[in-house]
C-alpha cells in the first residue's frame, strides 16, 4: 500500500537520494494520467511552477530543491488510491457486462478526479483482466 511504498522510500534503499527524486515525481504524475496542473490541484499546490521546479530539481534561482517528504507521502497515497480505483472498476465490470466505462475529458470530475485519472485506472484494470473492455461512459457529441 501507499505507506509501504513510502516506508521503502525512506528506509535507506535510496542510497543518498531524497525520498522522491524529481524524475520519480514526474514518472508518478505520468503513471497517474494527470497533467502537471491536475497533480498540483490534487496536492493542494496553488502554483504548478513549484511542481515543475521539483521535476527539475532546482528553482528559478538555480538552487537545488528537494521534494518535501509530505508531498512524497501524498503522491504514494494517490498511487494507492488509483490502484484501488482500478480494482473497483474491474470488479464492477466483471460483475456486469465486462466493460469498464470511463468519462470523456470534457465530462465533469468523477469522485473528484479528472477523466485522465479514470482512463489510467481503466487501463491498469484491463491489464490485470484482459477479458475486460474499455469504452466511453457516454456517446460522443459534436462538442467533444
Predicted regions and their residues:
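Short, small-residue-biased leader/transition segments that mark boundaries at the very start
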Residues: 1-6
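Recognition helix of helix-turn-helix/homeodomain-like DNA-binding domains
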Residues: 44-67
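Helix-turn-helix/homeodomain-like alpha-helical modules used for DNA recognition
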Residues: 83-144
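DNA major-groove recognition helix of helix-turn-helix
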Residues: 54-55, 71, 75, 79
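Short glycine-/small-residue-rich flexible loop motifs, especially phosphate/cofactor-binding loops
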Residues: 26, 37, 126
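Short alpha-helical "recognition helix" segments of helix-turn-helix
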Residues: 38-43
Amino acid at each position: 500500500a501507499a505507506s509501504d511504498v513510502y516506508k521503502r522510500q525512506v528506509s535507506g534503499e535510496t542510497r543518498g537520494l531524497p525520498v522522491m527524486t524529481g524524475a520519480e515525481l514526474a514518472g508518478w504524475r505520468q503513471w497517474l494520467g494527470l497533467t502537471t496542473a491536475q497533480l498540483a490541484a490534487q496536492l493542494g499546490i496553488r502554483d504548478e511552477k513549484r511542481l515543475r521546479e521539483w521535476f527539475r530539481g532546482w528553482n528559478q534561482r538555480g538552487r537545488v530543491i528537494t521534494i518535501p517528504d509530505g508531498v512524497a507521502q501524498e503522491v504514494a497515497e494517490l498511487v494507492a488510491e488509483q490502484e484501488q480505483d482500478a480494482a473497483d472498476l474491474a470488479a464492477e465490470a466483471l460483475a456486469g457486462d465486462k466493460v469498464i466505462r470511463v468519462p470523456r475529458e470534457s465530462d465533469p470530475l468523477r469522485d473528484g478526479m479528472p477523466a485522465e485519472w479514470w482512463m489510467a485506472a481503466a487501463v491498469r484494470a484491463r491489464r490485470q483482466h484482459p477479458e475486460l473492455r474499455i469504452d466511453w461512459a457516454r456517446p460522443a457529441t459534436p462538442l467533444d
